[in-house]
């Protein structure tokens, strides 16, 4: 899907066991192992199948609306007075975020495997909407597991999923957020392995999911690289993206990993601060452990019990991160930094006011980091940020906090 990485490349992982260094792998129930191996086999065939790639490209152009534009944020750049700021406009995709890139790829795989039922987990509802969308497009039934807390704070997306014909199952276990939804989806999958395809929405889970999701999302970085060379004649100095599970981030990061002149920063959800437990900064404040089929950085207590975490953004409210991010952090290729709720909220308003773009709260975390860094950089330097989703789904959350009832 991308050009072949060099042997000593940062882009050559994972190995045949799905590991990025000590991270990744396949930690799943025995009943799932044959299915996982089957999926991996099908994925390996699809990667080198010109017909699969052609269909993916066709749907990308005619259904998703790719390539998404590269946009120079003129007023934000002027306001901050430093580096030139460019956005990769993934919020302009069909369904309003980067999630659809992966969903189209995976549903084509599900069809190749003869699966007749789709299940998915969702936090902010963006992946749920994208899954329900592709299921409708290909005429397959779809069940979406969503934490009860998220069902409440993401009402517009719940309605969209139902309109699209999906069954939304609220999950009340734990804190009723993304982790709990993923647990329920895995339970469903174990019970219905024969006919069901689990469409995971982030670059985590058991191998081959982290690799698969990354490859489907790498179209973001590959396009951005070409577009940046066309616009500026060179690569950016800095690439920034928000990181929850990490699919939009790995999608824009991966094509730039071997470009040593490009600094890369992933922005985690700092929530209400790193001192307590009300954040989702797995790399900044977590430790390695196993969750949802892979080894990665997690928010856990001394006994290895998973902490609940918190973020203003439902899509970043996950106590882990994709294993490739854990590895990239350990080897020092990517820096991961936290942004607090209040900073994201401020950035959300700043972008809306200056550029007429209402960003998703997830992307607002990345914008907040850009707002911090741009003024410290030279006017001849360039920042590329992944604007991963639009903020329609977040107006209720933001309205409530700002005291503007909707």
Swiss-Prot record:
Record key words, sorted: Amino-acid biosynthesis, Aromatic amino acid biosynthesis, Lyase, Pyridoxal phosphate, Tryptophan biosynthesis
E.C. numbers: 4.2.1.20
Family matches, as InterPro entries: Trp_synth_b_CS, Trp_synth_beta, Trp_synth_beta/beta-like, TrpB-like_PALP, TrpB-like_PALP_sf
Top-rank taxon: Bacteria
Cofactor(s) needed: pyridoxal 5'-phosphate
Catalytic reaction(s) noted: (1S,2R)-1-C-(indol-3-yl)glycerol 3-phosphate + L-serine = D-glyceraldehyde 3-phosphate + L-tryptophan + H2O
Pathway where it operates: Amino-acid biosynthesis; L-tryptophan biosynthesis; L-tryptophan from chorismate: step 5/5
Gene Ontology molecular functions: tryptophan synthase activity
The protein's enzyme class: lyase
Pfam family, one: PALP
Assigned GO CC terms: cytoplasm
Modified residues (N6-(pyridoxal phosphate)lysine): 99
General function of this protein: The beta subunit is responsible for the synthesis of L-tryptophan from indole and L-serine. Essential for production of nod factors and establishment of symbiosis.
Family: Belongs to the TrpB family.
Complexes and interactors: Tetramer of two alpha and two beta chains.
Protein name: Tryptophan synthase beta chain
Species of provenance: Rhizobium etli (strain ATCC 51251 / DSM 11541 / JCM 21823 / NBRC 15573 / CFN 42)
Gene name of this polypeptide: trpB
